[in-house]
């Protein structure tokens, strides 16, 4: 079993249109993201800066926002669902 990552529409330009990605081996959210960065060129620049998530990017594990858990060190296990959700602004 793998960790499923939900990719929002705003980021699909760098994932080749993929809406989901499976990460086979990871024990933290940071490792999940590293797996995505290895797979999708340009994703890191869209969601991270200086080794941390950009402030307008929220990541959820099982519906819980990781900033209220252990951040990038939040534990994940097989079967978990990780959602990346950049904030959308408009006027």
What are these model-derived regions, one by one?
Residues 1-90:
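Ubiquitin-like/PB1-type beta-grasp interaction modules and other compact soluble beta-rich domains
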